């Protein structure tokens, strides 16, 4: 299967599986905008990173491991020179962790 088609299918699966939690993570990442993408509206520019994060989020045992996972996803997708330092992702990771705890409690 073509990688782009596979990525779109995976995106739809994750959106369906996580529902409102997916939207919450998307809003959090868009609001914190760690790569300083130029956008006034959340048009899904960070969707590949959100997909990568959510496909592995069950590995996160606590806030620290989620923070490391989030940083790793952005470092992989944008490169060491573009992603900034780990601290840049701390506030977003904290908000995502709180949303994840609410999601797991449902």
Each language-model region and where it sits:
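Charged, amphipathic alpha-helical regulatory modules used
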Residues: 1-106
């Amino acid at each position: 299967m073509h990688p782009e088609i596979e990525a779109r299918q995976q995106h739809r699966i994750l959106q369906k599986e996580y529902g409102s939690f997916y939207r919450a993570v998307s809003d959090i990442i868009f609001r914190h905008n760690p790569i300083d993408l130029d956008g006034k509206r959340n048009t899904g520019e960070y969707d590949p990173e959100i997909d990568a994060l959510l496909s592995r989020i069950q590995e996160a045992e606590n806030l620290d491991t989620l923070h490391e996972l989030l940083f790793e996803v952005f470092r992989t997708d944008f490169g060491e020179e573009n992603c900034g330092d780990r601290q840049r992702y701390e506030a977003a990771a904290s908000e995502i962790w709180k949303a994840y705890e609410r999601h797991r409690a449902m």
